[in-house]
From Swiss-Prot:
Cross-referenced Gene3D superfamilies: ESAT-6-like (1.10.287.1060)
UniProt KW keywords: Secreted
Protein source organism: Mycobacterium tuberculosis (strain CDC 1551 / Oshkosh)
Quaternary data: Forms a tight 1:1 complex with EsxV.
Upper taxonomic lineage: Bacteria, Bacillati, Actinomycetota, Actinomycetes, Mycobacteriales
Source taxon at top rank: Bacteria
Gene Ontology cellular component annotations, sorted alphabetically: extracellular region
The protein, known as: ESAT-6-like protein EsxW
Compartments where located: Secreted
Location (main, coarse): secreted
Family: Belongs to the WXG100 family. CFP-10 subfamily.
């Protein structure tokens, strides 16, 4: 399988935008899931069942938070690398033109 490196800063920023959209989607769905769990929690659940459900939902919420953080990390890395690539390309052009 051939590896392809992304060297187009505009494409890198576009891809970063996609990662931001994915992060927002995960965050929105996690928020809905948490709200739903809170609604269920008061609907006749009590004792160990409610505590276990809340613990599970808390762990899942943290897992989703970790996913969002990773997606933001990829987004930030793509933007940073696009900026670095442009700066290096500019420096190379200046060296070649002198």
């Amino acid at each position: 399988m051939t590896s392809r490196f992304m060297t187009d800063p505009h494409a890198m920023r576009d891809m970063a935008g996609r990662f931001e959209v994915h992060a927002q989607t995960v965050e929105d769905e996690a928020r809905r899931m948490w709200a739903s769990a809170q609604n269920i929690s008061g609907a006749g659940w009590s004792g160990m069942a409610e505590a276990t459900s809340l613990d599970t939902m808390t762990q899942m919420n943290q897992a989703f938070r970790n996913i969002v953080n990773m997606l933001h990390g990829v987004r930030d890395g793509l933007v940073r690398d696009a900026n670095n690539y442009e700066q290096q390309e500019q420096a190379s052009q200046q060296i070649l033109s002198s």
